[in-house]
Amino acid sequence: MEISVASVTVSVAVVVVSWWVWRTLQWVWFKPKMLESYLRRQGLAGTPYTPLVGDLKKNFSMRAEARSKPINLTDDITPRIVPYPLQMLKTHGRTFFTWFGAIPTITIMDPEQITEVLNKVYDFQKAHTFPLGRLIATGVLSYDGDKWAKHRRIINPAFHLEKIKNMVPAFHQSCSEIVCKWDKLVSDKESSCEVDVWPGLVSMTADVISRTAFGSSCVEGQRIFELQAELAQLIIQTVRKAFIPGYSYLPTKGNRRMKAKAREIQVILRGIVNKRLRAREAGEAPNDDLLGILLESNLGQTKGNGMSTEDLMEECKLFYFVGQETTSVLLVWTMVLLSQHQDWQARAREEVKQVFGDKEPDAEGLNQLKVMTMILYEVLRLYPPIPQLSRAIHKEMELGDLTLPGGVLINLPILLVQRDTELWGNDAGEFKPDRFKDGLSKATKNQASFFPFAWGSRICIGQNFALLEAKMAMALILQRFSFELSPSYVHAPYTVFTIHPQFGAPLIMHKL
């Protein structure tokens, strides 16, 4: 009997181990090689597959090397931000594949194909390739299918244009506070001094999203922003290890720190939500800001058309993070480029004076700022908040003249496309806001050559919010100051989810 039990145990163990080995080989070798063969038969060029790691090691190595030294102001930033995709573009042409671990990733530069990918949201879905990113937020940005559609429908009213116009006084209040702080710094130094504008812009945009979306001051939400920034840095430091299967579940020191920060964010947010619920019960809270709309949806969850409490928390985390990140990077690169191009700074200031004089900017006037709109579009073209988007294919799909198998990723290289000389001309790398003087459609020839906020039905829900906030900030700054690059400024754009200035943005501010 004992021999029989032992035999069965050994047999079961052999079967389990054999199954595990087969599945591992399938994942690490057979499936990737099958997909590689499929893509090469389509005529696609790409890198040979390296088991398990793919091109991640080369990608990380080139990025680390690129970040190790700053660049000149007039240099192309693409070799510093996306060095590996840029090298592959030069080697293999405008459509090629590389390897994200064991997953082939097809990079496309053709605007028609990009439009197709971004318009077919149910076929080309979000690529969930970076599990640690979920610690910062998930929300509508990362959902697919019916859940994405439901959340988008619920959130949309908070970002209607008329609703955003009503937020302009809050924009003014938050922006005025940082401008007044800079004014005092400059006044104390006899009308000119060096100011690193980056921390101030981060604080200002954090305050705006706190006031407008959550009905609280930045003091209440400041800890959330700090924790999310710390979490983002920890994730970037861990990025190489994050692609090891199961790594995020290991009790490493880094993982414990990240999860502790994520838990603290959750606790603070729950406190903000509970505070709003108590205010609602007392009839003292708005229902039409983002948090009010989310809570209204949560109360209707039992009918099947609202959000769960967990979903609500994720949307709050997402808008705290994205609402602050997107506008702060847009503003910092606008100030850097206007410091470099004094003629455009003068034109923007003259327009602000013509529209507002010394009066407080209002929504109607902000929408009349054509020169400022051109400048912001050009900044978004040269310094998009994120350098690339990715999508996943789960079944065989036609894309242009290609037939792509399920199980591959699509990379949409925003930065490379928006600086592409074939699409934008030989001056694609130069700061020339005049290219937008006749509007976006004319500048882009109605094609997806400009998509800093994505495209189609998944276009960033907060793009109008971000642009109006940026116009308010720049109008107030231009009314009070002229500015130029400080001798201590070091040009080193790098990616921490969005494109940041690695060493800040010290400018010489002159009081007008």
From Swiss-Prot:
GO cellular component term of the entry, any: membrane
One Pfam family here: p450
Binding site for heme: 460
Protein name: Cytochrome P450 72A11
Key words of the record: Heme, Iron, Membrane, Metal-binding, Monooxygenase, Oxidoreductase, Transmembrane, Transmembrane helix
SUPFAM superfamilies (alphabetical): Cytochrome P450 (SSF48264)
CDD domains the record matches: CYP72 (cd20642)
